[in-house]
Design a protein with these regions (language model features):
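Rossmann-fold NAD(P)-binding glycine/threonine-rich loop
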Residues: 82-86, 90, 102-122, 136-138
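Active-site capping/gating segments
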Residues: 124-142
Length: 231
């Protein structure tokens, strides 16, 4: 969802001047930079900054320095972690809003928040799990026009026969979104595993090549190839 949010943030009408993306893993940062580069963001008029907060001595101080001390108008939290929530609360600008997008499963999940800032700096905290029907329509329309890249979120592809086991074991299945084609039978398969499977299966070898020429992303060409193979 984080990659999808970055892609969306570059395209809406009242777009931000700057987007700062935080991670604690250089490999994931490099992957994000590969599929949504700083240069691509600049072409949309947005300054995009990727930072590894694990390498920071003082995370709050250094993140605020990226805004010249002003703070962030909007903070999105994509993990239900107390420390991350408290850090997000600490870097909001005046009249800022923090959105806890990651849904916690612990009914007692809580963290410390600055109620002084809530009163005097008009800071706000909200939680959301998705959008309205109109939001979905907008996303589909933008995807159809090529304005956003929903493919950056897809890491696995499978058929209808893979749904039950994938759903039951979702916490143990790494990666992002799992794309299901309901009219074919195919195990839920990671796009990154196509190359290994291609060592013994010519179809996956070709499918891997199609994805790799698209920065490792699923595409219309890959989809057409899959559907033709399983028809």
């Amino acid at each position: 969802m984080g990659l999808g949010a970055i892609s969306y943030g570059l395209t809406f009408e009242n777009k931000p001047k700057r987007i700062v993306v935080t991670e604690i893993n250089d490999e994931r940062i490099n992957r994000a930079r590969e599929v949504i580069s700083e240069e691509e963001a600049a072409a949309h008029g947005v300054e995009l900054i990727y930072v590894n907060t694990a390498a920071m001595q003082d995370q709050v101080k250094e993140l605020l320095e990226l805004t010249d001390g002003k703070g962030y108008d909007d903070v999105f939290v994509y993990i239900p972690n107390r420390g991350v929530c408290e850090m997000g609360n600490s870097i909001m600008a005046y009249d800022g809003c923090m959105n806890l997008f990651a849904g916690p499963t612990d009914m007692k999940f809580s963290s410390m928040i600055n109620l002084y800032d809530c009163h005097y700096s008009r800071s706000k905290i909200i939680g959301s799990t998705g959008g309205t029907i109109d939001d979905m329509k907008e996303a589909i329309e933008k995807e159809a026009k090529g304005l956003i890249k929903s493919a950056v979120m897809i890491t696995h592809v499978g058929g209808l026969d893979s749904v039950v086991e994938t759903t039951k074991n979702l916490p143990e299945v790494p990666g992002g979104k799992k794309l299901v084609y309901t009219h074919i039978n195919m195990p839920m398969t990671a796009i990154d595993d196509f190359g290994k499977l291609g060592e013994s299966d010519p179809f996956f070898k070709e499918l891997d090549a199609v994805c790799k020429k698209n920065k490792g992303l699923w595409s219309a060409e890959a989809e057409n190839m899959l559907l033709e193979h399983f028809q």
